[in-house]
Amino acid sequence: MLQPSPPHYSSSRDVRHHHHHHHHHHHLALSSKARVFPLSLPCNFSSRVSFKLQLHCAASSSSSVSPPRCSKPNPSSRKRKYGGVIPSILRSLDSSTDIETTLASLCLNLSPKEQTVLLKEQTRWERVLRVFRFFQSHQSYVPNVIHYNIVLRALGRAGKWDELRLCWIEMAHNGVLPTNNTYGMLVDVYGKAGLVKEALLWIKHMGQRMHFPDEVTMATVVRVFKNSGEFDRADRFFKGWCAGKVDLDLDSIDDFPKNGSAQSPVNLKQFLSMELFKVGARNPIEKSLHFASGSDSSPRKPRLTSTFNTLIDLYGKAGRLNDAANLFSEMLKSGVPIDTVTFNTMIHTCGTHGHLSEAESLLKKMEEKGISPDTKTYNILLSLHADAGDIEAALEYYRKIRKVGLFPDTVTHRAVLHILCQRKMVAEVEAVIAEMDRNSIRIDEHSVPVIMQMYVNEGLVVQAKALFERFQLDCVLSSTTLAAVIDVYAEKGLWVEAETVFYGKRNMSGQRNDVLEYNVMIKAYGKAKLHEKALSLFKGMKNQGTWPDECTYNSLFQMLAGVDLVDEAQRILAEMLDSGCKPGCKTYAAMIASYVRLGLLSDAVDLYEAMEKTGVKPNEVVYGSLINGFAESGMVEEAIQYFRMMEEHGVQSNHIVLTSLIKAYSKVGCLEEARRVYDKMKDSEGGPDVAASNSMLSLCADLGIVSEAESIFNALREKGTCDVISFATMMYLYKGMGMLDEAIEVAEEMRESGLLSDCTSFNQVMACYAADGQLSECCELFHEMLVERKLLLDWGTFKTLFTLLKKGGVPSEAVSQLQTAYNEAKPLATPAITATLFSAMGLYAYALESCQELTSGEIPREHFAYNAVIYTYSASGDIDMALKAYMRMQEKGLEPDIVTQAYLVGIYGKAGMVEGVKRVHSRLTFGELEPSQSLFKAVRDAYVSANRQDLADVVKKEMSIAFEAERECSSRSGEEEEDDEEENSEEDEAF
């Protein structure tokens, strides 16, 4: 009985999991002829190795199996017609799990060729190995290299490197020498697994046995180099082979690829560089008659079509179109047969380098030579035209596949669906899906998230759900695809739909969610600001048997830090460290930024120091947050200190950091220092950004340096990067310097640039117009803001409106009354203010719109509301409506106040009702009404309107008596100065 493999030859993955599963295998005896080295791979694998088999089988049975996705699949090798007993044996093996018993029951004496067929027809590595061991168990069996090649290939394709290594050692001790085919096959399977250096070590071993690679092996090495992006090395190897040399240049290749073969206890590179050569040296080196040795350095030329195809693809991917074309021409000249793959490769090479017409002409040449295009040919042309933006041509090639008698394959449908989905062509996508349904073709699993994303982006969430549910009826999606589907919903904030998909897996199939699905679901909750749900999901992960990874911790931590939930973030960070996961720089950066936003600079500094202690190097984002935080707080010395530390640590400062530094200097008015930093930014690639320029503009504006500010502003203009802050700062500067014409020019430019988009920007321009006395233009702008843009007004807006009311001649008592109504948030205060303002500016249509809002329901029993209605109707010339409003006011029990009397006397004057004016005048004269300049002025203006200038002059004299000339003068002057100061401060504050 064979001995089990020693523990040190089992893979690290088996060591971690061997205690979970047990598997029974048949015990087979080997003949004396088939000598097996004690360390060879036995048929009764150790529990560690058997776990792999069991795990593999379990995974295959539980995971989704991609259904056939084209109406006419390519025939498999099982469709080949074999003579004799082979077909019946294959059928028996297919229907049996007990391979050994089945083979033994047939009692057949198979020839080596028939044995080869049975080995090749097995689809799983375990079955290949069991059939092989059965053959070895017969005394008549003679080991041969072809059988070992089949077994080694099966193990390599399955990534069973430990088993392959043991099989190789067994092969050597059975005296079976590898051939060129063996080496070529090993290079191929290792290369396809991404183990480039390990693959090439087989060629080195080949050289030690004095074998020289044949053309097939050479082409395999070239393909490995090509697929790993090592185009120059591939070219050197090919040319070296032609000259009779082998040029591998192993030292320049990374020792361990990204998939980490170095992680296992006995890693592949160590095996290939030590154990492998040791085994090879134990046997006498024999030169095979079938292979040329390295001493034969006669020039060689490739002769196989497959070799030329590989080389053409190599030069195409390397961008060496001339070399690819020369090889194609050489094939034509030297008589090397050209096949469909050759043309496909040339078409792809030409098309991907922008030569679509040449690609099209190659298709015609292909047909002229009698070489039929296959589905892949049309797939290539379809993708090329789609990439070029010619969707109609791409779809034409899709339709042509069936026209010429071919069948679209998985790649075809995936490509056409992705193309249409990217361009949001919903109807066309559904037409393709309908055609696939008619031909009983299922949608490829990888296309499901793409189609769903198109639906969701177009607001067709119901259709997206229907597609997902339909696909799930007969197919279990992989975790990767499920995560992609959840992410489609997450990106649009559709957390309920994402949640349904997430929990649906557990409810429908009883499977636990993968960590990737948890990570995306946490992202979905984060996007929807449902942080409690995200935390709850995270806390329940372990109970469901899924452990968080670094991505889980980092995502959750950054989500919490992003919304300044620092306490929860700290707890996650502590748990992350306890679990052995190392937070990345982005994680620390998010937390430091959160502390800075909250003004917790000392906590930010503590975390920065902890970050350095754990060996995580701070990046420019970390330093930028700290520098900006100190700059905003006016702590210039600390900001500069961290800037110097950043330079000492060799971290390149970006524009954000330098802008923060300028901001710090601006806070304390250090112009020269700010200039130095700004000049440094000018010398950098792309120059200063708009944020840095705005910081410098602000500093110049505060210091009143017009020329330098204009220079910076003009530079922004030339680059087309002026933003709202740039324009506002320049308006503030010009207005502060009394340069109102220039301020208005900037305001006009800002308006034309389309940057008037929010309340703040409108306020800035309106304040500028108000300061320049362009009251009507200011009101037009306000109407655009209020009615057309429907922006929410803020206190800055109303400050400007009250300034306009004062400048528009509205009685000061009326302005105060409206301002009080606004401050007290009285109902309908805003339409009362706007109606009064538009009336004062002569914009009666706008005024009546606002008045309609006041009168559409019950007018509030407030003086400000009735006064606004009376004033609006009076100003627009509708005397009857104004008087009706006054009468309704009295009916409501509201006595007229000074504002009402002023508006009422104006109505009398416009209507020519002199007696009415006289009544108010009389009450004012005899003290029945409180003396008011506004009311005296209203009476005087009413007499003028009624063509009684004589009475207007009388009122003027009475005003002189009531308000002594000197007091009137000083008071008026003081009020004007106070008003001007108030207006100026209000206008300035709007900036």
From Swiss-Prot:
Residues 15-27 have a biased composition (Basic residues). Keywords: Repeat. Residues 61-73 have a biased composition (Low complexity). Residues 975-991 have a biased composition (Acidic residues). SUPFAM superfamilies: TPR-like. The keyword Ribosomal protein does not apply. Residues 965-974 have a biased composition (Basic and acidic residues). InterPro entries: Pentatricopeptide_rpt, PPR_P_subfamily, TPR-like_helical_dom_sf. PPR repeats lie at residues 144-178, 179-213, 214-248, 304-338, 339-373, 374-408, 409-443, 444-474, 478-513, 514-548, 549-583, 584-618, 619-653, 654-688, 689-719, 723-757, 758-792, 862-896, 897-931. This is Pentatricopeptide repeat-containing protein At1g73710. It comes from Arabidopsis thaliana.
